[in-house]
Amino acid sequence: MSGHSKWATTKHKKAVIDAKRGKLFAKLIKNIEVAARSGGVDPDGNPTLVDAIQKAKKSSVPNKNIESAVKRGGGLEAGGADYETIMYEGYGPNGVAVLIECLTDNRNRAASDVRVAMTRNGGSMADPGSVSYLFNRKGVVILPKGELTEDDVLGAVLDAGAEEVNDLGETFEVVSEATDMVAVRTALQEAGIDYDSAEANFLPTMQVELDEEGARKIFKLIDALEDSDDVQNVFANFDVSDEVMEKVDA
């Protein structure tokens, strides 16, 4: 299991009481707007919109905010911005490769925010292509464990193209090719299994094992990057042991 998955799980548990909740809501709303603009407002014909709405609902974003975001994205309500996706590449402390996915209406602001966060937290920017080759784009579906076993999940998703099921503690992570993600999510739904999120992520092909000090440094960098309103996702190729994670969480 990747260190970043553990970190994301830890943050997920804290999300409801986290001081950044408003910032999280804004990013989820932005996802919905962009999905509606690019694929239309009808969820039946827009699986990306379905998944953006699902993730927002699971994070307790109010329904009225979700509905407004869909309307803005579809041009049915004023106020929508023209967002573009930009990927930045860099290295964090201990040579950890970092991919930063931005969704922004101001390219210069996004670039500045990312550069400042990187340089102030032991990181450095890298040329396009110098880091991204260390990652593969995969479909990742996160589902609450509840009473489910790993075999329950495997039985539901194996024929839909799932490559692996990872136990993240309180959740399961189902990994597939990005093109198979909707089929995996649909298979879970048909089996009556609820899911928290389904999205295409960049997963590392190799990982850097970090000790407690290294873990704290990379988490500080990720936090600084995610503080930017323009940064939607941060992907990194590090791993930490359960023992180290417990110390960091303490």
UniProtKB/Swiss-Prot annotation:
InterPro entries: Integrase-like_N, TACO1_YebC-like_2nd/3rd_dom, TACO1_YebC_N, Transcrip_reg_TACO1-like, Transcrip_reg_TACO1-like_dom3, YebC-like. It comes from the Bacteria. One of its GO terms (molecular function) is DNA binding. It is found in: Cytoplasm. SUPFAM superfamilies: YebC-like (SSF75625). NCBIfam families: PRK00110.1 (NF001030), PRK12378.1 (NF009044), YebC/PmpR family DNA-binding transcriptional regulator (TIGR01033). This is Probable transcriptional regulatory protein SGR_6014. It comes from Streptomyces griseus subsp. griseus (strain JCM 4626 / CBS 651.72 / NBRC 13350 / KCC S-0626 / ISP 5235).
